[in-house]
């Protein structure tokens, strides 16, 4: 599945792994993925989240409050939580529904929103974001912008 990721989506995944290791977490959870999407900075997901008033510092603070810190890890965690794996599956499905043959940051965010019960969704709600409303707004936006040929895996 990673082979279909855009450069920005791969970068967001890398940031997710880095923040998990920095926080001393031995896994990559949806909360780390949310942080990575925002930290990436220029993808559709980052722009949407920034438009909702989110910052990487706000997400980091929420992660620390909800989960805490462990010992900083020298190696990046390899394991994705089952919920994060589910989010990736949902991201792929949402991309296909829209007619995209790649996974961009926008699809990763849609996967988080679609899954609906993760730590990432709790963080969004704690920061005043309505995940269901955001999901529907994003789907509408992406359907309006969906290229007929399925898009390019280098853009988002």
Where are these regions (language model features)?
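Histone-fold recognition with a strong bias for associated Lys/Arg-rich disordered tails
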Residues: 1-156
